């Protein structure tokens, strides 16, 4: 019995050794890099599209449950940033994927029923100032959240640049639950 299994393994190895050899054509490094770049750009666009959908739902939930929350804050319902303010893994292709500026805060997404939408702010707009205070190019999203929270329920005059034209938009803030909602890219379940 043992000699049969040895013979079977040996004949299998012999057949593998006598099989045809295939060679893949050489790949051009520029084509490989272009494919990698396209994958990264698509990944960034997909991630921020999912994040925008999540923010739409989260803002509605926060506003609807406003009276039931212990911790509340004022919110305007937009996500903005500059290339340096984005997470490091998104910086290299974010300008191409999202048209985000290096120096001016660019609106990445606006929640559908948000105060920012009511004020006419759209993705791609550049946010120059909030109540004549310049929007910084680093930690942009955190700065906006902090500014809106400190401003309270007072309207915010935002200088918006769209297609090279500056306009003042007035955003009337809304009180909402101050619960954190984040999009995490992890395959393990974290909610039950």
Regions found by a protein language model. Name each.
Residues 143-184:
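PDZ-domain C-terminal substructure recognizer with occasional recognition of PDZ-binding tails
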Residues 116-139:
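Conserved PDZ fold ligand-binding element
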Residues 8-16:
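Bacterial N-terminal signal peptides
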Residues 37-50, 110-115, 134:
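Second-shell loop/turn segments in exported
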């Amino acid at each position: 019995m043992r000699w049969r299994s040895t013979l079977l393994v040996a004949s299998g190895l012999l057949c593998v050794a006598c099989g045809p050899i295939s060679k893949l054509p050489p790949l051009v490094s520029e084509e490989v890099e272009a494919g990698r770049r396209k994958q990264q750009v698509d990944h960034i666009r997909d991630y921020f599209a999912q994040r925008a959908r999540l923010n739409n739902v989260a803002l509605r939930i926060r506003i609807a449950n406003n009276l039931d929350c212990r911790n509340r804050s004022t919110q305007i319902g937009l996500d903005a940033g500059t290339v340096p303010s984005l997470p490091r893994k998104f910086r290299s292709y974010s300008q191409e994927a999202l048209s985000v500026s290096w120096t001016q805060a660019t609106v990445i997404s606006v929640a559908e029923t948000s105060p920012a939408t009511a004020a006419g702010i759209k993705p791609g707009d550049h946010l120059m100032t909030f109540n004549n205070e310049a929007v910084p190019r680093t930690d942009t999203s955190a700065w906006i959240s902090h500014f809106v929270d400190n401003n309270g329920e007072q309207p915010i005059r935002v200088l918006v640049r769209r297609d090279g034209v500056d306009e003042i938009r007035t955003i009337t803030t809304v009180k909402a639950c101050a619960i954190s909602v984040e999009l995490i890219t992890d395959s393990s379940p974290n909610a039950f």
